[in-house]
Swiss-Prot record:
It comes from Arabidopsis thaliana (Mouse-ear cress). The keyword Ribosomal protein does not apply. Belongs to the BPI/LBP/Plunc superfamily. BPI/LBP (TC 1.C.40) family. This is Putative BPI/LBP family protein At3g20270. One of its GO terms (molecular function) is lipid binding. The keyword Signal applies. Residues 1-59 form the signal peptide.
Length: 515
């Protein structure tokens, strides 16, 4: 029976899972990469915190971020449009405070008027833009219109009688401009909105009274036009402040580490301040694996490398090969890179009879005995990423155990150094991977049943790797790892690019409603 080699409990860090799966790492599906992507999409503005800077060459950084994220100009455009839509849908209908006033009506006198149940029912954005400057990110909404509904009432008191009436009215707000400025800074490994400003102005309004005489209409206009404009401006500004405070709290509450399993966690602290470029936003994340329980080390500066664009996708996430190597080191030190196999891929029990042609000495001493293969990684696998893909070198010991008279006996052990390549693709929002054996070199470490001929050692190792090891790993990888994308979002036009010392995941983002 296949024992659990990888304990995959959570759906995250797809790229790390694929690679460390190929390296016999036993860990769950954390997502250093896509975990951030998921959190960003949960709160729209954090899309700006989530995208990676890229380059044809990824420089190594010792204390900076090992995962870099950038939002391109098209990514900012998407973030802007989604942000505006999200704010409108989650804010409306927006209730405004009641308004009362006294107005002098010609030939009638002073009339007490009141507006109640005032609310903004709809907002229509005509034009918008997002800018990145040294002093922050600026979101502007220009020339928007809004529809208001409200109830009106008036009371007129003469010497011996009182006249009153009520009804409803609608208001069209024209020329509404909103401007929001926010500055993101690093606060001990978390992101914080250091400063925020907003402004809302309204050019004019049109009021439509349902019922009432012409004097009433003119009275309402005279009494309330400026007050309605002022109320709309103040209420919208107040609501923006509330949402910015919630966003700030959310950013500071993002976890600084993510538990993977009982052996490891991922350092999720931000390194340095976000960099606002020409129509782009860049952040760095530490991203390294560490033993579970270790204290978080917060780096004081971001990576020194800036990356030139390699494609026009909205989002590009780059991961240095150091992230992968940190994973293999942590799991190797945790002593979990071990696999016990008692069955073949099709479920048949392993037996010495399967090896009588390849390892005749084994079959000669233990004919038709059940057997077990114990595989252990003997040093941290070394990962190397080039423009041609991901390669890894693994030092693996393979022990042959046989069951004889109810006892498990270790009868021989092979040592092999193998080179594997990992290829990846994305199918229906799932990341699919596969391993391919490039080369290997095997030697006999020790044997209790006599020395194996060199050609037998090579043949046995080849069979184990090709018929047992690789099919096992690839079966895991071909199940596909769902990318943690919330239901409102889809990823498309995905491209995986390998560069020197790093891997890039380039993608566009859309919503399920605009497919």
């Amino acid at each position: 029976m296949y024992n659990s080699w990888f304990v995959l409990k959570q759906k995250s860090n797809i790229l790390l899972t694929i690679l460390t799966s190929s390296l016999l790492a036993k860990f769950s599906y954390p997502s250093t990469l896509f975990f951030f992507l998921e959190m960003a999409l949960m709160k729209v503005m954090t899309i700006l915190v989530l995208f990676v800077s890229v380059s044809s060459t990824l420089a190594q950084s010792n204390n900076g971020g090992h995962i870099s994220i950038i939002v391109s100009e098209t990514g900012l455009e998407f973030a802007k449009d989604y942000l505006i839509k999200k704010v409108i849908t989650t804010t409306l209908p927006l209730q405004l405070p009641d308004i009362e006033n006294k107005v002098k009506i010609p030939l009638i006198g002073k009339v007490r008027m009141g507006l109640s149940n005032i609310q903004i029912d709809a907002v229509h954005v005509q034009s918008s833009k997002m800018e990145t400057r040294k002093d922050g990110i600026i979101l502007s909404v220009l020339g928007a219109t809004a529809n208001l509904s409200m109830d009106w009432s008036y009371t007129y008191r003469a010497s011996f009688f009182e006249i009153s009436d009520h009804g409803d009215a609608s208001v069209e707000v024209k020329g509404m401009n909103v401007r929001i400025t926010a500055t993101l800074v690093n606060d001990n490994g978390s992101l914080k909105i250091a400063s925020r400003e907003n402004d809302c102005t309204v050019k004019n309004i049109d009021i439509h009274i349902n019922g009432g005489a012409s004097w009433l209409y003119q009275g309402v206009v005279d009494a309330f036009q400026k007050m309605i404009i002022s109320t709309v401006e103040k209420t919208v500004s107040t609501k923006i402040v509330e949402k910015m405070k919630k966003l700030d709290s959310f950013l500071q509450s993002l976890p600084k580490q993510r538990k993977i399993d009982d052996s490891a966690a991922v350092n999720l602290t931000f390194t340095g301040n976000p960099v606002l470029g020409n129509s782009s936003v860049e952040v760095d994340i530490n991203g390294l694996f560490m033993p579970k329980g270790d204290d978080i080390k917060v780096a004081g500066s971001r990576s020194s490398s800036f990356f030139g664009g390699v494609n026009k996708r909205m989002v590009t996430i780059s991961v240095e090969e150091g992230v992968f190597n940190s994973a293999t080191l942590v799991y190797f030190n945790a002593k979990v890179m071990h696999l016990v196999m008692e069955e073949t891929k099709n479920g048949s029990i392993l037996s010495t009879s399967d090896w009588k042609l390849i390892l005749p000495e084994l079959y000669k001493h233990y004919p038709d005995n059940k057997m077990v293969l114990n595989m252990s990684v003997t040093s941290p696998p070394a990962v190397k990423i080039t423009e041609n893909g991901i390669d890894a070198t693994i030092q693996l010991d393979i022990a042959f155990d046989v069951q004889d008279s109810g006892e498990n006996l270790s009868v021989a052990r092979l040592s092999t150094i193998l080179s594997v390549a990992c290829s990846t693709e994305i199918v229906k929002n799932n990341l699919i991977g596969s391993l391919r054996l490039n080369d290997f070199n095997a030697t006999m470490k020790w044997s209790k049943i006599g020395e194996f001929q060199t050609n037998y050692v090579q043949a046995a190792t080849s069979r184990i790797l090709e018929a047992l090891f690789l099919p096992y790993v690839n079966t895991r990888l071909k199940r596909g790892f769902p990318l943690p994308i919330p239901g409102d979002f889809t990823i498309k036009n995905i491209k995986i690019v390998y560069v020197n010392s790093g891997i890039l995941v380039c993608t566009d983002i859309g919503t399920s409603t605009n497919q």
